[in-house]
C-alpha cells in the first residue's frame, strides 16, 4: 500500500483508545488512525456525529458496542466506508429481559465494571482484565451508561446487511461468551464480501487480548482488498 489508509477505530463499551493502542502500533506504516468516541443514547446520533468528524472515505474498525456503531455508520453512509473490520459483533436486537447495564452503571458502577471485566476477556488473562478496568474508569459510568442505552435500543439489522458491499473482516474469539463464533459466522455470511476469522484462546476483545495476531489478520485483509477490484456500492 503506497499511501497510509485513513482508518477510524471505535472502541467497545467503556473502552478508550488503549483498546487499539498495540494494534495501531503494529499497523502504523499502512494506516492513518483516528480513534473516535461518541457516547450518546442512540446509535444513530453517535453515527451522525462520527460521520461529521471522519475523513471523506475511510476504513472502519469497531469492537462490540463499537462494531454495532460501525454497522450503523456503514449503513448510513456506505459510500464513505472503504472496508470494515468488526470484532465481537452481534447484529441482532437485544434479547428481551436481558440485564439493564445502563441502570447498573448509574447505580453501582464499580460492581458493573468488575462484572464486565470478568466476562469480556478470558478469565485467565488478568492483564487484559486490568486494562479493561482502567479504561472503564477513565471513560466513566455516565458515558458507559449512554453507550449501554444505545445498545439496548438498537434494531435488528440482519435484513439490511446485504446492503454492505464493501470488503469486511469479521473477527471473533473462540471463547467469546457475548458474541460467540456462530454469530460471527452468520454475520460474515450475511454480508456479500465478508471474511470470517476465528481467534483461538481469545475472548470478546481481540485487539486487547491478542493485538499482534489481530493486527496481522487486518494487515493481510487490507493487502488482499487492495489487490482485488472493488465491488460496486
Where do the language-model regions lie?
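Gly/Ala-rich beta-loop-alpha elbow adjacent to hydrolase catalytic centers
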Residues: 62-66, 70
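Catalytic active-site module of serine/aspartate enzymes centered on a nucleophile-bearing elbow/loop
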Residues: 194-233
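Conserved alpha/beta-hydrolase "acid-adjacent" motif
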Residues: 128, 177-183
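Conserved HGGG/HGGXW glycine-rich cap/lid loop of the alpha/beta-hydrolase fold
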Residues: 1-44, 49
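Conserved alpha/beta-hydrolase catalytic His-Asp/Glu region
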Residues: 95, 107-163
Amino acid at each position: 500500500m503506497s499511501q497510509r489508509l485513513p482508518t477510524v477505530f471505535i472502541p467497545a463499551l467503556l473502552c478508550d483508545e488503549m483498546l487499539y493502542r498495540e494494534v495501531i502500533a503494529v499497523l502504523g506504516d499502512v494506516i492513518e488512525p483516528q480513534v473516535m468516541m461518541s457516547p450518546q443514547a442512540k446509535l444513530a446520533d453517535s453515527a451522525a456525529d462520527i460521520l461529521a468528524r471522519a475523513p471523506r472515505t475511510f476504513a472502519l474498525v469497531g469492537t462490540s458496542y463499537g462494531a454495532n456503531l460501525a454497522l450503523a455508520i456503514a449503513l448510513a453512509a456506505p459510500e464513505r466506508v472503504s472496508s470494515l473490520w468488526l470484532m465481537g459483533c452481534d447484529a441482532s436486537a437485544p434479547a428481551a429481559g436481558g440485564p439493564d447495564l445502563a441502570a447498573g452503571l448509574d447505580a453501582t458502577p464499580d460492581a458493573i465494571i468488575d462484572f464486565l471485566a470478568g466476562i469480556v476477556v478470558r478469565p485467565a488473562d488478568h492483564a487484559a482484565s486490568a486494562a479493561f478496568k482502567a479504561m472503564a474508569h477513565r471513560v466513566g459510568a455516565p458515558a458507559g451508561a449512554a453507550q449501554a442505552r444505545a445498545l439496548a435500543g438498537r434494531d435488528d439489522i440482519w435484513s439490511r446487511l446485504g446492503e454492505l458491499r464493501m470488503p469486511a473482516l469479521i473477527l471473533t474469539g473462540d471463547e467469546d461468551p457475548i458474541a460467540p463464533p456462530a454469530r460471527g459466522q452468520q454475520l460474515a455470511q450475511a454480508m456479500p464480501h465478508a471474511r470470517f476469522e476465528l481467534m483461538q484462546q481469545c475472548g470478546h476483545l481481540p485487539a486487547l487480548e491478542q493485538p499482534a495476531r489481530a493486527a496481522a489478520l487486518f494487515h493481510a485483509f487490507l493487502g488482499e482488498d487492495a489487490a482485488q477490484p472493488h465491488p460496486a456500492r
